[in-house]
Amino acid sequence: MSALTLFSVTDPQTPVWHSTDAKAIQAQLNAKGVRFERWQADRDLGANPSPETVIAAYQHAIDKLVAEKGYQSWDVISLRADNPQKEALREKFLNEHTHGEDEVRFFVEGAGLFCLHIGDEVFQVLCEKNDLISVPAHTPHWFDMGSEPNFTAIRIFDNPEGWIAQFTGDDIASAYPRLA
């Protein structure tokens, strides 16, 4: 179940607000300029689908976003617990960073935790299958896939080069709860 937990940057262990209600999550995030919607990830992808299979199954969703915002490229990130690079990838994504473009993800399988550092607050958004999130350009954030990752998400970009991060050097992420 999708969830949003809100923290103050002054107390990273005590939640200020928490909800699993999609409308409440959407309202909180929309107020900060973050798009959050529940879409339908209802296509049968089979076991370990190829990126091409995922793209073909959800081309209609990609086309909708391209028509709305003019995105130029997309790909699929899919990580499982047996991935030999899971620890290195987790550490990379756990470092606070920004992008020069919106970070758009549509989760079609599994879950991951987006943590958004907005002003003096941290919004931990547990995204699961059916969730679309768009983090605005230049928003400091990090992503936790957990120690045993299990997710597939379509990534959509303004930049044809794909995922390009500017790391902030702030170790704020280490103070907040992580996925198991």
UniProtKB/Swiss-Prot annotation:
Keywords: Amino-acid biosynthesis, Dioxygenase, Iron, Metal-binding, Methionine biosynthesis, Nickel, Oxidoreductase. Pfam families: ARD (PF03079). One of its GO terms (biological process) is L-methionine salvage from S-adenosylmethionine. Pathway: Amino-acid biosynthesis; L-methionine biosynthesis via salvage pathway; L-methionine from S-methyl-5-thio-alpha-D-ribose 1-phosphate: step 5/6. It is an enzyme of class 1 (oxidoreductase). The record marks 96 as: May play a role in metal incorporation in vivo. Ni(2+) binds at residues 97, 99, 103, 141. Its EC number is 1.13.11.54, 1.13.11.53. The keyword Amino-acid biosynthesis applies. Fe(2+) binds at residues 97, 99, 103, 141. Its cofactor is Fe(2+); Ni(2+). Binds 1 Fe(2+) cation per monomer. It catalyses: 1,2-dihydroxy-5-(methylsulfanyl)pent-1-en-3-one + O2 = 3-(methylsulfanyl)propanoate + CO + formate + 2 H(+); 1,2-dihydroxy-5-(methylsulfanyl)pent-1-en-3-one + O2 = 4-methylsulfanyl-2-oxobutanoate + formate + 2 H(+). The record marks 105 as: Important to generate the dianion. The record marks 102 as: May play a role in transmitting local conformational changes. GO terms for molecular function: acireductone dioxygenase (Ni2+-requiring) activity; acireductone dioxygenase [iron(II)-requiring] activity; iron ion binding; nickel cation binding. The keyword Oxidoreductase applies. Monomer. Catalyzes 2 different reactions between oxygen and the acireductone 1,2-dihydroxy-3-keto-5-methylthiopentene (DHK-MTPene) depending upon the metal bound in the active site. Fe-containing acireductone dioxygenase (Fe-ARD) produces formate and 2-keto-4-methylthiobutyrate (KMTB), the alpha-ketoacid precursor of methionine in the methionine recycle pathway. Ni-containing acireductone dioxygenase (Ni-ARD) produces methylthiopropionate, carbon monoxide and formate, and does not lie on the methionine recycle pathway. Belongs to the acireductone dioxygenase (ARD) family. This is Acireductone dioxygenase. It comes from Klebsiella pneumoniae subsp. pneumoniae (strain ATCC 700721 / MGH 78578). The gene is mtnD.
